[in-house]
């Protein structure tokens, strides 16, 4: 499995590095090929599109809050790649509404292990 983490380093004013370190250990332990893309606010869409073309992930994990979730969903709109949410923003409203586990590492385990994939309507 190839997993792409899309990380907003400043969402919710929460340090993402402790989560990323634990996530890297988990992925390495299970032999999951992963890549971390950190948003900067400068040409993120262009950079992400290139990564999607080059890396060709099997799944994407959106790491941040609602804004990161929206950015990730829009970026994957015309792709056939399942997306999961790692709730590391300030309110995590979308993650809460979608019953995503509130603990980031457990949410990652759900993304990695779940075979239940659902479509969502985007307006």
Residue locations for each model-derived region?
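Gly/Ser/Thr-rich beta-alpha loop segments that engage phosphate groups in nucleotides
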Residues: 14, 66-67, 89-93
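Conserved functional loop/turn residues at catalytic and ligand-binding sites
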Residues: 56, 64, 80
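Catalytic core of DAGKc-family lipid kinases
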Residues: 4-6, 30, 78-82, 86-123
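ATP/NTP phosphate-donor binding region
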Residues: 1-60, 70, 74-75, 106-108, ...
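Glycine-rich beta-strand-to-loop/alpha-helix junction loops that act as flexible
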Residues: 9, 63-65, 86-88
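Short gly/ser-rich anion-binding loops that grip negatively charged ligand groups
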Residues: 58, 62, 97-98
